[in-house]
């Protein structure tokens, strides 16, 4: 578990599935993912995170508010796992923070802690992040974290059909500190 001033970042548990679905499946939260989805799709995401934690020792962890234990969202690191893209095995940082917590610096606090963990616990030369071009809050955070746009690494996400605007990913990276 990672602890910050206001947050706990922890591995997933089976009982997180319905809580995550309720948090993440609103029209605003799913705006840049193509809209709300059935619970089974979010359950599959949680299953992948549990598997990644077991295999790699990290994943995009549950973000909890320390004071209340309430799930605020997701943030952490995973191995990209997108073959046939410019980022097939990148150490990816990502986040999804619930609407109730927007504008409070939760994503930044969780992302900074995740990046610090990544530098301390992996030998990766850089950390990458990607999102759709219209997701200005996400790439704005990437910039505030010190990440740099890498147009040479932009790609089509394999989970989206050709021509689907949600599949056009822009990439930011940050190099390991000296």
Please place each PLM-identified region on the residue numbering.
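Short, charged, low-hydrophobicity "junction" segments
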Residues: 42-52, 120-128
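Conserved GNAT-fold acetyl-CoA-binding loop/helix
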Residues: 28-50, 58-61
